[in-house]
């Protein structure tokens, strides 16, 4: 709010690793990108893959084609494979960061929610639709991510109530839930 009053753009970053779930954020990206009050960036990153004998207990990352998929959006490559170095998100001075998925275990330390939340507000739009009772909501609301977010965008009033119940169970009371629909169905 203060930035727009001072004619400063609001910096929003989409941290993306999985082209298959982009439709859950695509319309959100489009709306923000077309609004002159926002400076929107996509940072394409690789993801940890489960390895035999190690599971996810390692620091090896593999691309799911993110860099190529978001190239037409002018994405920033978040990982230099030759130097094995991560792009510093802080260089973009983010006000808000959207993650495609809520799984800290699959990201490098610098991109884990507890580190990003120190300098930006984390927003989350679920990548999967919860058909009541199918267990998706419980799977996609890990406590170690939920405690760091500022905004959780829910698909309907029932979903909003269920998310608030999960937040109460986790003893988290500072996340704002907002009913917005399910962006994957916007098109």
Regions found by a protein language model. Name each.
Residues 1-11:
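Non-catalytic membrane-proximal stalk/linker segments that position and tether the catalytic domains
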């Amino acid at each position: 709010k203060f930035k727009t009053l001072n004619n400063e753009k609001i910096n929003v970053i989409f941290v993306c690793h999985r082209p298959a779930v982009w439709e859950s954020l695509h319309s959100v990206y489009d709306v923000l990108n077309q609004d002159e009050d926002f400076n929107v960036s996509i940072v394409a990153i690789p993801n940890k893959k489960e390895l035999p004998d190690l599971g996810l207990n390692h620091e090896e990352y593999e691309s799911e084609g993110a860099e190529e998929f978001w190239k037409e959006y002018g994405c920033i490559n978040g990982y230099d494979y030759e130097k094995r170095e991560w792009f510093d998100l802080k260089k973009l001075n983010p006000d808000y960061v959207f993650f495609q998925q809520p799984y800290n275990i699959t990201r490098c330390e610098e991109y884990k929610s507890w580190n990003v939340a120190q300098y930006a507000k984390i927003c989350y739009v679920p990548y999967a639709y919860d058909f009541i009772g199918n267990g998706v909501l419980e799977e996609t609301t890990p406590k170690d991510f939920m405690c760091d977010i500022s905004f959780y965008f829910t698909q309907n009033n029932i979903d909003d109530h269920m998310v608030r119940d999960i937040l109460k169970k986790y003893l988290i009371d500072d996340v704002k839930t907002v009913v917005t629909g399910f962006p994957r169905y916007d098109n």
